[in-house]
Curated annotation (Swiss-Prot):
Binds 2 manganese ions per subunit. This is Polymerase acidic protein. The keyword Ion transport does not apply. Phosphorylated on serines and threonines by host kinases, including human casein kinase II. GO terms for molecular function: endonuclease activity; metal ion binding; RNA binding. The gene is PA. Plays an essential role in viral RNA transcription and replication by forming the heterotrimeric polymerase complex together with PB1 and PB2 subunits. The complex transcribes viral mRNAs by using a unique mechanism called cap-snatching. It consists in the hijacking and cleavage of host capped pre-mRNAs. These short capped RNAs are then used as primers for viral mRNAs. The PB2 subunit is responsible for the binding of the 5' cap of cellular pre-mRNAs which are subsequently cleaved after 10-13 nucleotides by the PA subunit that carries the endonuclease activity. The keyword Nuclease applies. One of its GO terms (biological process) is viral RNA genome replication. Keywords: Cap snatching, Endonuclease, Eukaryotic host gene expression shutoff by virus, Eukaryotic host transcription shutoff by virus, Host cytoplasm, Host gene expression shutoff by virus, Host nucleus, Host-virus interaction, Hydrolase, Inhibition of host RNA polymerase II by virus, Manganese, Metal-binding, Nuclease, Phosphoprotein. A motif (Nuclear localization signal 1 (NLS1)) lies at residues 109-124. It is an enzyme of class 3 (hydrolase).
Length: 709
């Protein structure tokens, strides 16, 4: 154990807190710096529950934190049994005897409520959550704590932070939440033996294989002779693409592919309000919108503009308003909610027949034939929505991102500046708006699925953002906005397997009339009017427009939940691609060429009026982000198969650019495999059309492997 950490802990922490922290570090094998973090957390828990009595004179709080794990689990289970509570799947810090509820204490350095949101996403309302920050901020999901408790805790945290800063240990001890502790590993004898056993034949050891790979130099003649030898053993003849050129991909014909994403994008309309840190939970946000924005006045008309089951949707909307009004967010089971939620409508299995009974006929035991999906043609609406996603929205800061760690060298300074530049471009796009909506909404759905699988719950379709004006003026704390796009109803969700499905019914706001070809899956009502702010010169005027309610029943799986709730990963992939290009150019020139590369290096993004369109990397970022996000929301077996097969055509195109020969066994079969994946996925059809355009352009520029017609 490092004497430095131990001495610092003993200088300002109570001896009992230091002892508990040392035991915890040894028990869980944490880094020594955790001594101070654990000690501070334990002392805060003690301050929270010390010297407080219940109405009967006994201790009000039971301290669970600081005990051995086995003892803590036994104590928590005993408390649950004594007070007739459901057992919790996680350990809490404190138990409140007076309110018969567990308490979770958190401590953070962050200036926003992201740490609280992560805790709330895991724990929900199953216990009371209080998150204290070193700068005097308190995030919570309930009333409390007492004023005396807060003052004692904040005073202690301020003293601890000042002491650690004087010792120059604050940044070292409290690492950013996304930074992992470096683990030093040594290659032991067993590891080396296993490594040598895993090398492929004819190599005997890893070092032998490594030496061969480092000295290997390809011999084209030798490789050609080996190919000709193998060709005699293969029945399929090798076909060179110069003689067997690729034709264009045939797109399916038929009705236009409908919109299949779970939430509206371009047509979505949002109501906004200034965010209240004290009321940041999903249910509280929804209550505030209905109370302050008078959204309860939204009443769908009797006859829908299009769609099925209007009576069911209208009645369910009225039940949603009642659930929000009584603040329970729970819808009781009835004919409408059960019908739309798919409760009791699962296909029945063939009943088991006892061995003593005779089977009358085998026809009843046959499974019905699966109907293949109907092929759909390329949707004209997709291009317009793609371009809309690239453009800027009215607000910015849609996707919550982690803080940047301190830079240790000049190259990391370049990278930090580059990432902030790219994030500034991407955070204000319409695509980022939809990503933020997926992250928060699906995250809330995941919480409800885990905590209330047997209930029908109401969840807002919402996102958070920041005002552009405050961001541009450089204000210290930009105004955060809560944006409500609609309401989602989660049906019963017993997700036992990764592919387990559950039904959701969405009610989304819009000021646009439905497109019959695009919105085939929606039932759309007129639902009153709303006021739209429009700029006329330098003044802003309000115009009243019709408000539409788009209703739809769809389903989400456990895997899809995970994809959509982690949509911010699209940022990482996009920014990593451009960052690699910029840092490579800077490393070659041994100077900072980040801005020059962003502004001067061009990237092809599409065609317009028969001509290629290229944009600087700074703007092409938007296209990269939209593509990554669309992969996330439209991903299915069709898209996976298409991307897997199209790589071979792109490899042939790259070989043609480098004037290399390309060949394969069955080029026509490759195209047929690609066309098998083109059924009704809009993203697949869009990418196939883009690939055809790329082939046409390559042929005009002299490509040898593609037909011009």
């Amino acid at each position: 154990m490092s004497k430095t950490f131990a001495e610092i802990a003993e200088a300002f922490l109570e001896p009992e807190a230091v002892r508990i922290a040392k035991e915890a570090v040894e028990e869980y094998g944490d880094h020594e710096r955790k001594i101070i973090q654990i000690g501070i957390h334990f002392q805060v828990c003690c301050m929270f529950c010390d010297e407080y009595l219940s109405t009967n004179g006994s201790d009000r709080f039971v301290l669970i934190e600081g005990r051995k794990r086995g003892t803590a689990v036994s104590l928590q289970n005993e408390l649950c049994k004594s007070y007739d509570l459901e057992p919790l799947p996680f350990l809490c810090d404190i138990f409140d005897r007076e309110e018969k509820q567990f308490v979770e204490i958190g401590i953070t350095r962050k200036a926003d409520d992201s740490y609280f949101q992560s805790k709330f996403g895991k724990l929900g309302n199953s216990c009371k959550i209080f998150v204290f920050s070193y700068d005097g901020r308190l995030d919570k999901n309930c009333e409390g704590p007492m004023e005396e408790q807060k003052l004692r805790i904040f005073s202690f945290l301020a003293t601890a932070a000042d002491f650690l800063r004087k010792e120059n240990m604050f940044n070292e001890i409290f690492l950013p939440d996304n930074e992992e502790t470096i683990i030093e590993m040594k290659k032991g004898k067993t590891f080396l033996e296993l490594r040598d056993e895993s090398v492929p034949l004819p190599f005997q050891t890893y070092e032998q294989m490594k030496d061969y790979c480092e000295k290997f130099k390809g011999n084209p003649r030798e490789l050609a002779s080996k190919v000709s030898q193998m060709q005699s053993n293969i029945k399929l003849p090798i076909k060179h693409y110069e003689q067997n050129k690729f034709r264009q991909i045939r797109l399916p014909k038929g009705p236009m592919a409908p919109y299949t994403h779970k939430f509206l994008m371009e047509e979505a309309w949002m109501f906004t309000k200034i965010s209240d840190p004290e009321r940041s939970r999903a249910g509280e946000i929804l209550i505030d919108f209905f109370k302050k924005g008078n959204l309860s006045a939204i009443r769908p008309k009797d006859k829908p503009l299009q769609g099925k089951y209007p009576i069911h949707y209208k009645n369910l909307w009225n039940q949603i308003k009642a659930a929000i009004a009584d603040r329970t967010m729970v819808i009781n089971e009835n004919d409408h909610s059960e019908f739309l939620g798919g409760i009791g409508r699962a296909s029945k299995k063939i009943p088991e027949i006892s061995l003593t009974q005779d089977v009358i006929t085998t026809e009843g035991l046959k499974q019905s034939e699966n109907k293949l999906p109907e092929p759909r043609s390329f949707p004209r609406w997709f291009n317009a929505e793609w371009m809309w996603a690239i453009k800027d929205s009215d607000l910015t800061g849609w996707v919550p991102m982690a803080e940047y760690p301190p830079a240790d060298n000049e190259l990391e300074d370049y990278a930090e500046h580059l990432n902030k530049t790219m994030e500034g471009v991407l955070q204000g796009t319409n695509c980022a708006r939809e990503m933020g909506k997926c992250i928060l909404t699906v995250g809330a759905l995941m919480t409800e699925c885990r905590l209330f699988p047997g209930k029908i719950k109401v969840v807002p379709i919402y996102a958070r953002s920041k005002e552009r004006k405050s961001m541009q003026e450089g204000l210290p704390v930009p105004s955060e906005m809560d944006c409500l796009f609609g309401i989602c109803v989660k049906s019963k969700s017993h997700l036992n397997k990764d592919d387990g499905m559950y039904t959701i019914i969405t009610f989304e706001f819009s000021i646009r009339e439905p497109n019959l070809e695009k919105h085939q899956k929606y039932t759309v009502f007129e639902a009153g009017h709303t006021t739209v702010r429009m700029k006329k010169g330098e003044s802003v005027i309000g115009r009243e427009v019709p408000l539409y309610l788009y209703c739809r029943t769809t389903a989400l799986s456990k895997i899809k939940n995970d994809w959509l709730s982690k949509a911010r990963r699209c940022f990482i992939t996009t920014m990593d691609t451009v960052e690699t290009i910029c840092l490579r150019e800077s490393a070659k020139a041994e100077e900072n060429l980040v801005e020059k590369t962003l502004n001067e290096k061009q990237m092809w993004i599409g065609k317009k009026n028969g001509e290629l369109i290229a944009q600087p990397l700074r703007e092409a970022l938007r296209v990269q982000l939209v593509q990554q996000f669309y992969f996330c929301i439209y991903n299915d077996s069709q898209l996976e198969g298409f991307c897997n097969e199209q790589k071979k055509i792109l490899m042939a195109l790259e070989g043609d650019k480098k004037n290399k020969s390309s060949f394969g066994f069955n080029p026509e079969g490759l195209l047929e495999k690609i066309e098998e994946c083109l059924i009704n996925n809009p993203m697949c059809l869009f990418m196939a059309q883009r690939l055809n355009e790329l082939v046409i352009e390559a042929s005009k520029r002299g490509a040898k492997f593609f037909k011009t017609d």
